[in-house]
Structure formats: C-alpha cells, structure tokens
Amino acid sequence: EQCGRQAGGKLCPNNLCCSQYGWCGSSDDYCSPSKNCQSNCKGGG
C-alpha cells in the first residue's frame, strides 16, 4: 500500500489519486469517489 488509511494517511505524489485499497494511480478505478477513492479524487472527494 502506498497511500490512504493503509499507509498511515499518506498522500500520493504528483497529485495521483489514492484508491480504496491504498494504491496511487490516475484512472477512474483510483480517482472515482464511487470507487471509494481516498485522496486527490475526481469531483473533489
């Protein structure tokens, strides 16, 4: 895990989104609030 609650609240570098599973990425699977994105989400989540 790289980010979010699984990584002690870390944020992703380069404004990447943090997925519900604690990984950084830029696709909808990482960024969509409906997929429980944790940080830097699309839609201001």
UniProtKB/Swiss-Prot annotation:
Disulfide bonds join 3-18, 12-24, 17-31, 37-41. PROSITE patterns: CHIT_BIND_I_1 (PS00026), CHIT_BIND_I_2 (PS50941). Residues 1-43 form the Chitin-binding type-1 domain. One of its GO terms (molecular function) is chitin binding. Pfam families: Chitin_bind_1. Keywords: Chitin-binding, Disulfide bond. InterPro entries: Chitin-bd_1, Chitin-binding_1_CS, Endochitinase-like_sf. N-acetyl-D-glucosamine / N-acetyl-D-neuraminic acid binding lectin. Can inhibit fungal growth. This is Pseudo-hevein. It comes from Hevea brasiliensis.
